[in-house]
């Protein structure tokens, strides 16, 4: 997944050279045209429309991505999210990155606006899914991070957590589907 603003900021902090977001966008568009990347627009889950400003990009061939990084990038959760995105697209789903805002109180009891993200919002006909993809949910911090947006968005869309473990499909106390990546990719979305 790529975000042009993050790339520009990272380039500046690591290489100590300024590159504009517009230049990064140009290069990303070249990669999209060359079928190296695919764009996933953000979708406001409460407003029910696409948000044009920020986008995520996924690699169409994760092997090329890994080769370019000398197989050194080890965030398996993000790589799995990329694979799940590609498989949904291959199976003719419309896929967006789900977002919504919430007004919350900070520690000083001041109202703050917070944006939450659901990894993938997939649609195909009358099939609608909110999908969180993670390497595992054994760690309490990870579990809270993955569950919180799904709990906060209170509608009838099926909520799924895809885990990079060989587990059988189950439902948890929230009604969320918990499923292993292999089962999800080979059976669930077909």
What feature does the model see in each segment?
Residues 22-190:
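A cross-kingdom feature that marks ATP-driven nucleic-acid transaction machinery
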Residues 1-11:
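Short acidic, hydrophobic short linear motifs in intrinsically disordered regions
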Residues 10-23:
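Short, positively charged loop/turn segments that connect secondary-structure elements
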